[in-house]
């Protein structure tokens, strides 16, 4: 989810939000057909507030084609978002996190077993939706899902001893986040009838902007006015990019930070760890990576028609940078 973003022209913005609403409505309709034993669990988090990023990107990419409101666009957007919602269930179990989208997570409201099954059901529903699309579109969904699961496994296992930790982190970001957003753009553009080059360009743009947004979220979690990290978050084995950069420094402050992040952190020490992170070069270096990904995303814009959709995508790229400033 991201906060509401102005896309410029009011009518264009209204059309985009109508497209997102159709996707959300289809998701709710499909999940409402679940057996009563799991209906409440699988519907959790669908309407958690904010603008769902993957449906937004699907609908924006669809504006490049001649049929942006086609049913295939809605089905594809719903399938991708359901896959994302499924991973939220599984991620929170792995992370032992009690919040998701600023809402108590499935594993907190119910149990880990319930959360895993709810995630599985969302994946199954996504597959059912994707099966309504043509074989090429179905293949895009399947390949994105395979890449996503690979990223989840890579994140869970951690980097091998010979792999640079930052290189590992960025690869995971591309696999876990970039994969679905790239697929959102590719499907939105392809199913609305956009040209082949535009489809390729918007898919690459999506991968870059997805990475930028993911890192921005990691930065905001540390540097925001109301930082969202708990002691459990900070003590996780999987550190975020600002943390990884901060831990590479060789200073007394970094030595203390390394000591704090070596294991579970008592909540009494969270403020100290956040202060050390905020005073380190880690946040600035992570912001530079966000800017680099945003620049790569902008490189794709000249290959898209100079119309409102392109300007809206440019706004989205700018938002990725400004969000963490």
From Swiss-Prot:
Superkingdom of the source species: Bacteria
Residues binding Mg(2+) 2: 91, 95
Reactions performed catalytically: isopentenyl diphosphate + dimethylallyl diphosphate = (2E)-geranyl diphosphate + diphosphate
EC number: 2.5.1.1
Annotated positions for site Important for determining product chain length: 92, 217
Binding site for isopentenyl diphosphate: 54, 84, 101
Variant or mutagenesis effect after changing residue 217 to D: Leads to the production of longer chain product, specifically (E,E)-farnesyl diphosphate (FPP), in addition to GPP
Keywords: Lipid biosynthesis, Lipid metabolism, Magnesium, Metal-binding, Transferase
Induction field: Highly up-regulated during the early stages of invasion of the human blood-brain barrier.
Stored InterPro entries: Isoprenoid_synthase_dom_sf (IPR008949), Polyprenyl_synt (IPR000092)
CDD domains: Trans_IPPS (cd00867)
Short sequence motif DDXXD motif: positions: 91-95, 217-221
Pfam family, one: polyprenyl_synt
Pathway(s) of this molecule: Isoprenoid biosynthesis; geranyl diphosphate biosynthesis; geranyl diphosphate from dimethylallyl diphosphate and isopentenyl diphosphate: step 1/1
UniProt GO molecular function: dimethylallyltranstransferase activity; metal ion binding; prenyltransferase activity
Cofactor: Mg(2+)
Knocked-out gene: effects: Invasion of the infant human brain microvascular endothelial-cell monolayer is significantly decreased in transposon mutant.
Xref: PANTHER family: ALL TRANS-POLYPRENYL-DIPHOSPHATE SYNTHASE PDSS1, GERANYLGERANYL PYROPHOSPHATE SYNTHASE
Domain notes: Contains two aspartate-rich motifs, designated as FARM (the first aspartate-rich motif) and SARM (the second aspartate-rich motif). Rv0989c contains arginine in place of the second Asp in its FARM and first Asp in its SARM. The primary role of the FARM and SARM is the chelation of the divalent magnesium ion cofactors that assist substrate binding and catalysis, but it may also play a role in determining product chain length.
Function in brief: Catalyzes the addition of isopentenyl diphosphate (IPP) onto dimethylallyl diphosphate (DMAPP) to form geranyl pyrophosphate (GPP). Is probably involved in the biosynthesis of decaprenyl diphosphate, which is required for mycobacterial cell wall synthesis. Could be required for host endothelial-cell invasion and/or intracellular survival.
Family that this chain belongs to: Belongs to the FPP/GGPP synthase family.
This protein's name: Dimethylallyltranstransferase
Record gene name: grcC2
């Amino acid at each position: 989810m991201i906060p509401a973003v102005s896309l410029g022209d009011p009518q264009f913005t209204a059309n985009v939000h109508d497209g997102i609403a159709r996707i959300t409505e289809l998701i709710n309709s499909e999940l409402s057909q679940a057996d009563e034993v799991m209906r409440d669990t699988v519907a959790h988090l669908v309407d958690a507030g904010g603008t769902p990023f993957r449906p937004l990107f699907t609908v924006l990419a669809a504006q490049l084609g001649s049929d942006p409101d086609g049913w295939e666009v809605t089905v594809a957007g719903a399938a991708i978002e359901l896959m994302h919602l499924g991973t939220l269930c599984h991620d929170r179990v792995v992370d032992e996190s009690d919040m998701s989208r600023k809402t108590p997570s499935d594993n907190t409201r119910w149990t880990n077993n319930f959360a895993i099954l709810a995630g599985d059901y969302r994946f199954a529903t996504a597959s059912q939706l994707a099966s309504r699309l043509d074989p090429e579109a179905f293949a895009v969904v399947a390949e994105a899902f395979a890449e996503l699961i690979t990223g989840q496994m890579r994140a869970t296992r951690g980097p091998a001893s010979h792999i640079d930790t930052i290189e590992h982190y960025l690869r995971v970001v591309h696999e876990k986040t970039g994969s679905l957003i790239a697929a959102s753009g590719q499907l939105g553009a392809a199913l609305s009838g956009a040209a082949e080059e535009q489809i390729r360009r918007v898919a690459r743009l999506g991968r870059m902007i997805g990475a930028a947004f993911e890192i921005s979220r990691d930065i905001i979690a540390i540097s925001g006015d109301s930082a969202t990290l708990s002691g459990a978050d900070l003590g996780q084995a999987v550190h975020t990019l600002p943390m990884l950069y901060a831990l590479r420094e060789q200073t007394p402050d970094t030595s203390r930070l390394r000591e704090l992040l070596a294991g579970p952190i008592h909540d009494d020490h969270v403020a100290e760890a956040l202060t050390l992170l905020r005073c380190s070069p880690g946040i600035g270096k992570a912001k530079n990576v966000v800017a680099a990904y945003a620049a790569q995303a902008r490189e794709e814009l000249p290959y898209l028609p100079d119309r409102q959709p392109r300007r809206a995508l440019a706004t989205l790229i700018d938002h990725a940078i400004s969000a963490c400033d």
